[in-house]
Design a protein with these regions (language model features):
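Conserved active-site tyrosine of GNAT-family acetyltransferases
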Residues: 108-109, 232, 237
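Conserved donor-binding loop and adjoining core beta-sheet/short helix segment
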Residues: 26-88, 172-183, 188-191
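Acyl-donor-binding surface of acyltransferase catalytic domains
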Residues: 57-65, 69-135, 246-248
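Conserved acetyl-CoA-binding loop-helix of GNAT-fold acetyltransferases
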Residues: 76-89, 195-210, 229-234
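Glycine/small-residue-rich hydrophobic helix-like segments
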Residues: 169, 173-218
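Conserved GNAT acetyl-CoA-binding A-motif
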Residues: 91-101, 210-221
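Short amphipathic alpha-helix that is part of the acyltransferase structural core
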Residues: 1-27, 117-159, 165
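Acetyl-CoA-dependent GNAT
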Residues: 45-62, 132-133, 140-144, 149-181
């Protein structure tokens, strides 16, 4: 077995297998496609790649190379710890940031982890709701062509506002830079209009619009933002993963 640097194209079929196994939103999916953001490593058996590891080296991770994906074909997971340590030796990362629904990456990173923390919860849709807010109307502020382009290019998104009596009281939207067909919903309610169910209503309607656009809604929230957590849950979202981070010790 060997671990060596690789181009994304070499591990594309393995990434496709990883996506199928995840069967949900992958928060860090777009990092692979951003030029210069990731160092990819192939784990090879003979002349064939049987796994890969990914280290983020740009953006928020510019000064702290960070493992965010590690994948092995199922037949080679009996050697998972050995191969993960070989990947660490080859890539020399300082930290990790993984989605706990990615069980292999999570298990491997936690084995070598120090200073573990979590700051975001990932949600998936589980129920259809029918909340209403008296006098509220939803208005799209992004041109339809721009939304369609964002869906196709997996970059950007669309934005909507909630208006009451002609005044904008909340803003939200969906982003598409995730694995197809998933989108990420976000929202913010102006302070004077909070605790009235407007956030829940907005999330509910953004979910509906996601499906109309052919996307599957997902969402994220800070672990400390209790009002947002409540709004997401009331709109039919359930938590299914954390984003864990920490530093990595050496094998």
């Amino acid at each position: 077995m060997q671990v060596r640097r690789a181009e994304h194209a070499e591990i594309q079929s393995l990434r496709d297998a990883f996506r199928r196994e995840m069967d949900g939103q992958i928060v860090h999916d777009s990092i692979h496609a951003r030029l210069g953001w990731t160092l990819e490593y192939a784990i090879t058996h003979g002349d064939r790649a049987i796994g890969y590891g990914s280290v983020a080296v740009a953006g928020p991770w510019r000064d702290r190379p960070t493992v965010y994906e590690f994948y092995l074909e199922p037949a080679f997971r009996l050697r998972a710890f050995e191969l993960f340590d070989a990947f660490l030796d080859a890539s020399n990362p300082q930290a990790f940031e993984v989605q706990t629904s990615d069980t292999l990456s999570t298990m491997m990173c936690l084995t070598r982890a120090q200073d573990i923390g979590t700051e975001r919860i990932v949600f998936r849709d589980a129920a259809t709701t029918m909340h209403t807010v008296t006098g509220a109307t939803l208005r799209c502020v992004t041109p339809p062509d721009a939304i369609r382009t964002a869906i196709e290019e997996r970059q950007g998104g669309g934005e909507w506002v909630v208006e009451i009596d002609g005044a904008v009281v909340a803003r939200g939207g969906m982003l598409f830079h995730y694995n197809r067909p998933y989108s990420d919903i976000y929202m913010n309610v102006d302070e004077p209009f909070r605790r009235r169910g407007i956030g829940t209503y907005l999330v509910q309607e953004l979910k509906r619009l996601c499906y109309e656009l052919g996307a599957i809604p997902s969402a994220r929230c800070s672990t400390t933002n209790e009002p947002s957590r409540r709004a997401l849950q009331r709109a039919g979202f359930v938590p299914f993963a954390h984003i864990l981070f920490g530093s990595l010790g050496r094998p």
